[in-house]
Amino acid sequence: MALAPSKVSTFSGFSPKPSVGGAQKNPTCSVSLSFLNEKLGSRNLRVCASTVPLTGVIFEPFEEVKKSELAVPTAPQVSLARQNYADECESAINEQINVEYNASYVYHSLFAYFDRDNVALKGFAKFFKESSEEEREHAEKLMKYQNTRGGRVVLHAIKNVPSEFEHVEKGDALYAMELALSLEKLVNEKLLNVHSVADRNNDPQMADFIESEFLSEQVESIKKISEYVAQLRRVGKGHGVWHFDQRLLD
């Protein structure tokens, strides 16, 4: 269908064509256009708009907020912000807080070991101190999220960790890094469990929080420490450990 430029009329105003008998019917036709069809000849196109008002109410906020699940609590110990936050999700977040704090505690013990004067691997000490701080930040981030959703933070006990990390066959550097790799995989497993709890309780906000704030970073940490383990296995327990330690200081 081709438009014929010479046949197209200009807008003729907004006066609709009256119906038979002079009474205007709905819909109102306000614009008339002409176009040329090669087979059918000249045709008119009329643009119409209905004048029938909308009578149905789409949204009544003052009625909707009367639902019981939207009622604002009055008890002093009840969260005002909590909505669609299952008890299982709240418990899972508290458990993950404990996991992160325990991981931080292990890394802090490793930092103290490598910082000793008779071990003196400052690069390893720096790496494990930063790892400890990172896990603690993760715990604090989870605590903040718990409060955001209207849950209550419950801190569980932190287990005692060893203070000696010497290993006869592997040496302390490789042994400590393999321990760190196992720990990162364990934390990742726990995070995936928290994500499954969110899915099971149909909580997309919590699932998105775990995905965006933790999971990607966790697999990157696993990859990095895996490379450290592979490199330490190559250098052995001797002079190569010192060179690797210097690299961690950079």
Swiss-Prot record:
EC numbers for this chain? 1.16.3.1
> Which residue interval is the transit peptide?
1-49
Q: Which residues bind Fe cation 2?
A: 135, 184, 218
Annotated Gene Ontology cellular component terms: chloroplast
What ranges does the record give for the region Extension peptide (EP), renumbered to this chain?
A: 50-82
The record, for InterPro entries, names: Ferritin (IPR001519), Ferritin-like (IPR012347), Ferritin-like_diiron (IPR009040), Ferritin-like_SF (IPR009078), Ferritin_CS (IPR014034), Ferritin_DPS_dom (IPR008331)
Question: Gene3D superfamilies, alphabetically?
Answer: 1.20.1260.10
Query: Can you supply a Gene Ontology BP term from the record?
Result: intracellular iron ion homeostasis
Residue ranges constituting the Ferritin-like diiron domain according to the UniProt record: 83-236
What is the catalytic activity of this protein?
Answer: 4 Fe(2+) + O2 + 4 H(+) = 4 Fe(3+) + 2 H2O
The organism's superkingdom is given as: Eukaryota
Sorted alphabetically, the keyword list is: Chloroplast, Iron, Iron storage, Metal-binding, Oxidoreductase, Plastid, Transit peptide
As for subcellular location, the record says: Plastid, Chloroplast
Q: Which CDD domains does this chain map to?
A: Euk_Ferritin (cd01056)
* Positions with a binding annotation for Fe cation 1: 100, 135, 138
One Pfam family this sequence matches: Ferritin
- Grouped into one coarse class, the protein's main location is plastid
Molecular function (GO) terms for this protein are:
ferric iron binding; ferrous iron binding; ferroxidase activity
Please report which protein family the annotation says this sequence is part of: Belongs to the ferritin family.
What is the documented function of this protein? Answer: Stores iron in a soluble, non-toxic, readily available form. Important for iron homeostasis. Has ferroxidase activity. Iron is taken up in the ferrous form and deposited as ferric hydroxides after oxidation.
Query: What is said about its interaction partners and assembly?
Result: Oligomer of 24 subunits. There are two types of subunits: L (light) chain and H (heavy) chain. The major chain can be light or heavy, depending on the species and tissue type. The functional molecule forms a roughly spherical shell with a diameter of 12 nm and contains a central cavity into which the insoluble mineral iron core is deposited.
Q: What is this protein called?
A: Ferritin, chloroplastic
- The species is Malus baccata var. xiaojinensis
Tell me the lineage of the source organism: Eukaryota, Viridiplantae, Streptophyta, Embryophyta, Tracheophyta
